[in-house]
Amino acid sequence: MDALLGTGPRRARGCLGAAGPTSSGRAARTPAAPWARFSAWLECVCVVTFDLELGQALELVYPNDFRLTDKEKSSICYLSFPDSHSGCLGDTQFSFRMRQCGGQRSPWHADDRHYNSRAPVALQREPAHYFGYVYFRQVKDSSVKRGYFQKSLVLVSRLPFVRLFQALLSLIAPEYFDKLAPCLEAVCSEIDQWPAPAPGQTLNLPVMGVVVQVRIPSRVDKSESSPPKQFDQENLLPAPVVLASVHELDLFRCFRPVLTHMQTLWELMLLGEPLLVLAPSPDVSSEMVLALTSCLQPLRFCCDFRPYFTIHDSEFKEFTTRTQAPPNVVLGVTNPFFIKTLQHWPHILRVGEPKMSGDLPKQVKLKKPSRLKTLDTKPGLYTAYTAHLHRDKALLKRLLKGVQKKRPSDVQSALLRRHLLELTQSFIIPLEHYMASLMPLQKSITPWKTPPQIQPFSQDDFLRSLEHAGPQLTCILKGDWLGLYRRFFKSPHFDGWYRQRHKEMALKLEALHLEAICEANIETWMKDKSEVEVVDLVLKLREKLVRAQGHQLPVKEATLQRAQLYIETVIGSLPKDLQAVLCPP
């Protein structure tokens, strides 16, 4: 294995570094720098161990030039270990999400923008948070004073590829726990040879003698997910392991105990309501939170969410304060102490140990928040919220029939995912249609005038439009759709959706204006214009061209070439001194 990993030329690079004190901030990397390809997938790899004197301690960070603040190190240490209530023995995989200290980073190269412009909004890189994907091992070991070997291998990334990174950890971690540092360095070197994440393309990712084949969804894909097509297999030895999805969880397994409350939970997610998820272990907690936040796809989940959260987190006080309304966050925890601390929260979901028996597990009950007890709270959804829409009984019957017929879990998950997707689309399509009607007509966009403005969004006008163009056209669910839209208008998700759509429409308007300029006769326009007006046009065209070349404006390559030709034509008509200013040697 080591010989296989060590073949081929390798750039000089840093050694595995102990996690000593560092200043905050990130070491900027250019695309040609060492670890640039690695950084397209991962920020760093961490190893967290248990020290008898220090407790959880960061043993190493790799690459060793990646800088974490002391607060980030502390968060990674606590979030990478199950708390004492979980009692996880053996190997456990889970994930967490933590805030980056110091706010959003500046992208160190254009690949971030390039990737985000092509990826579905739900799979875009996180600008201000890290995902941590954890493989934790706790086994008896008589050679250790405490009597147990306790260590976590953590992949830190800005990409929400939970399935991919869990699969990667299941390959790397067992080998690492046996061979330690040399194995990890070789793996990181392999990842540094991977192609960049490219939405819409099938990628072959070699690691530890295995080729993992994945396809990252593209923004232009049809809604229904499909596994990557296998091709070029004859040139790949060994044959690749095809990962059906980089991000989709087994929804049916996650939601088995709460299927009767899916409608209520979907509405709580849509409205961005604060929700505490109390689970018996970090793997159950993190999967439930990630499953809940995926319910709104293809909408971006605009609220905060923490798949696994502990009382040691630096944001503990922020989330548990009673001096203001609970924040819009989905919080996954395993410590029952949170029941007491957060009993003022409006919605609390308590789930038990997962049971994968043949029958559908006992469904958690809907209970009033006043029924909350402290540490011995029974499984249930504790909320006073009443769903606006009736639940889909036909879906429940289909899923129950699937359980009786021993239908595979992935097929059950596909049924559930399709239901949630169609529900979200039925809700959002009327909003999309109304928003599109606010766009100025193309014939009103003329080359030499400022483009007309997008009309303002009127909630009353939209609600009136639902009578003839509402969700009832595509969804059979009955209920108070109007009431749901009214509450949605007050939620972070409406604000996030509206800002994103308005931004896209403004860019489209700008692109149409650029096309109108490029299709006009510029020489006729210049005849009666002053030099100041001509120079102003050059500067504005250049600005639009830069934005378009940076993939910010949706324009065709032919339009870009025509715009460049226009700029050259206009500059050529100016006196030599102005030409020298606009085109310095």
Swiss-Prot record:
PROSITE patterns: DENN. GO terms for cellular component: cytosol; recycling endosome. InterPro entries: cDENN_dom (IPR001194), DENND6 (IPR024224), Tripartite_DENN (IPR037516). It holds the Pfam family DENN. One of its GO terms (molecular function) is guanyl-nucleotide exchange factor activity. Residues 246-373 form the cDENN domain. Keywords: Cytoplasm, Endosome, Guanine-nucleotide releasing factor. It is found in: Recycling endosome; Cytoplasm. Residues 43-214 form the uDENN domain. The keyword Cytoplasm applies. Residues 375-499 form the dDENN domain. Guanine nucleotide exchange factor (GEF) for RAB14. Also has some, lesser GEF activity towards RAB35. Belongs to the DENND6 family. This is Protein DENND6B.
